Amino acid sequence: MVHYKVSYFPIRGAGEIARQILAYAGQDFEDNRIPKEEWPAVKPSTPFGQLPLLEVDGKVLAQSHAIARYLARQFGINGKCAWEEAQVNSVADQFKDYLNEVRPYFMVKMGFAEGDLDALAKDVFLPGFKKHYGFFANFLKSAGSGYLVGDSLTFVDLLVAQHTADLLAANAALLDEFPQFKAHQEKVHSNANIKKWLETRPVTPF
């Protein structure tokens, strides 16, 4: 039996997509949450000096989207054909661009940096959020299935639904302009295995 181990900090963050794919697949895995104080000792042993990591029977893979793509292919949620897979990857890459664009806001909001949160919300987060959720809305509309690509769940649905859930928890009014993503989040998180994971995973602030 294949042994999967996901190593990340004790938060959701970039490690959550791997956990959710494995949970969706009903696959047992080792959820290795590394405390901040232990990270300096672990860091030199990682391929790129960062987390998350996926270990598959001892073989190590780094980078969250590489991990997500590998697991999605293993468990059949990477699109039903080569074109769908490419579309899924394009949305995933754009989602990463979105997170990079709004990163200054979230770094201050989460207490990892100092800055004017109100100004960052107005000048960085809201423009980035509206722009990129507008892009993603076009994919939802084009698919016409309630999913972002094709007619079944893919790993980008997990990515976007988790982020939407986090935004709703922080400020439900944020999604008033994009009600289709409230419906999308509810659809994705109604999956029995995902629902079980969300109910039983460790409670973390982000």
UniProtKB/Swiss-Prot annotation:
Residues 2-79 form the GST N-terminal domain. One of its GO terms (molecular function) is glutathione transferase activity. Pfam families: GST_C_3, GST_N. GO terms for biological process: glutathione metabolic process; innate immune response. Glutathione binds at residues 8, 39, 43, 49-51, 63-64. The keyword Nucleotide-binding does not apply. Residues 81-206 form the GST C-terminal domain. InterPro entries: Glutathione-S-Trfase_C-like, Glutathione-S-Trfase_C_sf, Glutathione_S-Trfase, Glutathione_S-Trfase_N, GST_C, GST_superfamily, Thioredoxin-like_sf. Keywords: Transferase. Its EC number is 2.5.1.18. PROSITE patterns: GST_CTER (PS50405), GST_NTER (PS50404). The keyword Hydrolase does not apply. Transmembrane segments: none annotated. It comes from the Eukaryota. It catalyses: RX + glutathione = an S-substituted glutathione + a halide anion + H(+). Belongs to the GST superfamily. Sigma family. Conjugation of reduced glutathione to a wide number of exogenous and endogenous hydrophobic electrophiles. May play a role in the detoxification of reactive oxygen species produced during pathogenic bacterial infection. This is Probable glutathione S-transferase 7. It comes from Caenorhabditis elegans.
